[in-house]
Design a protein with these regions (language model features):
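ATP/Mg2+-dependent ligation/transfer catalytic cores
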Residues: 1-136
Length: 136
C-alpha cells in the first residue's frame, strides 16, 4: 500500500472494513510494542499522536507515538472482517521534541552521518525462532 495523505488512509479504512489500528514501536531493548485503537479513533491519532506512559522517571514518562503514514500495512494473519491495520511510529516527547530512545530516529540520524561520510548504511531485520519437539 502506498498512501500519501491522511484522507487516503481514512478512505482505505472505510473501504476495507478495518476495525483496529495498531501503532507499533520498538522499546530501547529492540522489542516491538503495540498500542491498538479502534479505527474510529484513527483521525485523532493521526493528528495528535497516541499518548502513552513511557519507561523513564515518573515526571518524564509521558510519550507520544507519531505514525509514519508510509508504513501502513494490513496484518494478513488477521480476519478479513474487522481487519487490523498497522503503522510503525516514531516516539516523541509531548512537546514534539525528539525522544532519545526512539530507535527509528536514531537510525535516521546514523544514516545521515554515514551519508555525510560518503558511506551507505544498509540495515535489515534478522528473524530468529526456535522449534521444539512436543513430547506428546
Amino acid at each position: 500500500m502506498s498512501y500519501n495523505t491522511q484522507q487516503d488512509i481514512l478512505d482505505f479504512v472505510e473501504d476495507n472494513n478495518v476495525k483496529f489500528v495498531r501503532f507499533a514501536f520498538c522499546d530501547i531493548f529492540g522489542t516491538q510494542k503495540n498500542i491498538a485503537v479502534l479505527a474510529s479513533d484513527l483521525p485523532k491519532a493521526m493528528e495528535d499522536g497516541v499518548c502513552f506512559d513511557g519507561f523513564m522517571k515518573v515526571e518524564e514518562s509521558d510519550l507520544v507515538l507519531r505514525p509514519d503514514l508510509s508504513t501502513v500495512t494490513i496484518l494478513p494473519w488477521r480476519p478479513t472482517e474487522g481487519r487490523v491495520m498497522q503503522f510503525f511510529c516514531d516516539v516523541e516527547k509531548p512537546d514534539g521534541a525528539a525522544f532519545g530512545g526512539n530507535c527509528r530516529g536514531f537510525l535516521r540520524q546514523m544514516s545521515r552521518s554515514f551519508r555525510k561520510l560518503g558511506l551507505t548504511c544498509n540495515v535489515g531485520a534478522e528473524c530468529e525462532f526456535y522449534l521444539f519437539e512436543n513430547d506428546d
